[in-house]
């Protein structure tokens, strides 16, 4: 599956959402998350991300390895709704994401 890492925090371009054929990219308050059980590993999201925040789970850079766990934590509470469009934006970013200082452009 794919994981969205730190470059997405406070940016949320959402080009990946438009590209995803299975509606598995969910929106938190500060970043986007890919549902590991709903993702079909097509990779369509990765090249369209303008901030290069999306990685195959085995290719996440070491400095962002904690984002795989943050992604899992996001869905531990949300469960598997069967499509992001049914949910809309939620405020259940994991605490590790909530605690990050503001990101993105000044």
Curated annotation (Swiss-Prot):
One of its GO terms (molecular function) is 3 iron, 4 sulfur cluster binding. [3Fe-4S] cluster binds at residues 8, 16, 49. It comes from the Bacteria. Transmembrane segments: none annotated. Residues 30-59 form the 4Fe-4S ferredoxin-type domain. Binds 1 [4Fe-4S] cluster. Binds 1 [3Fe-4S] cluster. Pfam families: Fer4 (PF00037). Residues 81-106 are annotated as: Disordered. Keywords: 3Fe-4S, 4Fe-4S, Electron transport, Iron, Iron-sulfur, Metal-binding, Repeat, Transport. InterPro entries: 4Fe4S_Fe-S-bd, 4Fe4S_Fe_S_CS, 7Fe_ferredoxin, FdxA_Actino, RnfB_subfamily. PROSITE patterns: 4FE4S_FER_1, 4FE4S_FER_2. [4Fe-4S] cluster binds at residues 20, 39, 42, 45. Its cofactor is [4Fe-4S] cluster; [3Fe-4S] cluster. The keyword Ribonucleoprotein does not apply. NCBIfam families: FdxA_Actino (NF045480). Ferredoxins are iron-sulfur proteins that transfer electrons in a wide variety of metabolic reactions. This is Ferredoxin.
């Amino acid at each position: 599956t794919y994981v969205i890492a730190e470059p997405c925090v406070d940016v949320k371009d959402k080009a990946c959402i438009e590209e995803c054929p299975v509606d598995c990219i969910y929106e938190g308050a500060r970043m986007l998350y890919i549902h590991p059980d709903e993702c079909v590993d097509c990779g369509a999201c990765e090249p369209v991300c303008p901030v290069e925040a999306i990685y195959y789970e085995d290719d996440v850079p070491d400095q962002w390895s904690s984002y795989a766990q943050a992604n899992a934590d996001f869905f531990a509470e949300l469960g598997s709704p069967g499509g992001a469009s049914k949910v809309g934006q939620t405020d259940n970013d994991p605490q590790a994401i909530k605690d990050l200082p503001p990101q993105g452009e000044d």
